C-alpha cells in the first residue's frame, strides 16, 4: 500500500483515479541485447530494456539519465528536437530515484518505468518547466501544474528530461516554429522531422531519449513517426484523458506514444490510458494490459487497403511501401480487399475546426507566424464552427460505417516525401494549407472518427528517407491495431537490433 500511496501523492488534485500498473515488463525486454550490453549502448536499448536494467539493479537511474543528457548536449543542436532541456531537475530526479533504490530490497515492486528518461511535447504542461506551445514569445512561460498524462508518466516512474519542440500551436505537420531550431529528420538532415510532434520524433530517432510523448490532432504523431522511421500510435477517442483542460476541437486530438517498437508504444499507452475525473468522453480500461495483448497473434483478419484516398494520389515510393505490407499480410493468411472512402467532403469541416482551434487559443494573433495568423483571421463565427462539427460528425459516421466491413484498413501515412527544411516558407498561407492537405490527407479521417491508428516503418526510399504505412482500426479496437502492427513489424524487421542513423550511433 505504501508504494501505491507514494505514486498517488505525485498526482495533481484533479486526478482522482490512478490505475495500478502491476504488469511485469521483464517479460518484454530483449535479453539477447543484454548479452553484449555495454554502458555506451543505452541508446540502442528499448525503454522496456532500460526499465529492466534498473529493476534488476544492473544500472542506476542516475547513470541512464546522465547518459541521455550527455547525448542531448552532443547532438540536439544538430537535430533541433528540444525546446527546453531540464538539465538540473532531471538529474535531481534521477539522484532521488537512485537513492530510493539503494534503500529498498531487491524484491520490492517499482513503478514500471522507474528511472527511464522520457520527453514531453511542448504543448503539454510539466510543472515548473516552460510551456511555449511553439510560440517564441512564450519561451519563459512556466507551467504551474502537470497535465494528466504527464502526472501519469511521472507516477509510472519516468524521469522527464525536457520539452520537445512542436509546430506553433501544433497546427502543422512540419516543425519549424520561428524562434526555435527546426526539428530535422535524423535520417536525412535536409528534411523536416514532420509535425506537429516533430521534436519528439527527432529525439527518439536520434537516440536522445528512448521514448517520447506526442499528440495527434490530424496526424501529428503518425506523420513525424513516418518521417523518422518510428512507431507512432494515435489511440481511440477517449482512451487517453486530456485533463485538466477542456476540449474545443470536438475530440479530434489525443495524446500518443512515439517509439522505435510497437511493444514500447503499447507499454506507454498502458501508462497514459484511463479515465480522469470529469472527462467528457472516455473508454473503459482493457481487461489486460496492451503490452500483453500486443504480442499475441491477431488471428486471420479481413483487411481493406488503399494506395491513396481520393481525390489525392500518392507517389510511387509510397505505393511501393503499401504493396510491401499487403504482400506480408497475404503471406500471413489475412483476407485483403482494395477499398477506401473519399475524403473530399471532410476537407472543409476539418479545416474549419482546425482554424477555430487557432482562434480559440487565447494567444494574440500578432505573436503567431503568418500561417497561424491567417488561420485565426479566417476562423469564422461560432456558428461556422458548429456547422463544421456537425458536418464532420456526419462524415465520421460514414467512415465508421465503412470500417464495419473490415477489421482494419491499411493506408499511406502521407502521399509523398516530407518537405525539406524551409521548403514551404516562401508560400502564401493559403498555399501552405493546400500543400498540407494534399500531403497528409490519409491521416485526418482517423481523427475525425475517433479511430485508433498507427504508423509503422516499412523501409527507406532511394534518397534514404523512411517509408511507412498506417493501420486504422474500428472504434476502440486499439488492442487489435497494436497486435496487427506488431505482427507486421516482426515480419518486416524480425528481431534485429535497434538501429540509429549512422552519425548518431554510439
UniProtKB/Swiss-Prot annotation:
An example of a GO molecular function for this protein is: amidase activity
Q: What is its EC number?
A: 3.5.1.4
Q: What class of enzyme is it?
A: hydrolase
- Catalytic residues, chain numbering: 121 (charge relay system), 196 (charge relay system), 220 (acyl-ester intermediate)
One Pfam family linked to the record: Amidase
Keywords linked to the UniProt accession: Hydrolase
InterPro entries referenced in this protein's UniProt entry, alphabetically: Amidase, Amidase_CS, Amidase_dom, AS_sf
Claim: Hydrolase is one of the keywords in the record: yes
The record ties this protein, via PROSITE patterns, to:
AMIDASES
**Reaction catalyzed:** a monocarboxylic acid amide + H2O = a monocarboxylate + NH4(+)
Annotated SUPFAM superfamilies: Amidase signature (AS) enzymes
- Please indicate if the UniProt record lists Hydrolase as a keyword: yes
Entry's family note? Belongs to the amidase family.
Q: What is this protein called?
A: Putative amidase
The source organism is: Synechocystis sp. (strain ATCC 27184 / PCC 6803 / Kazusa)
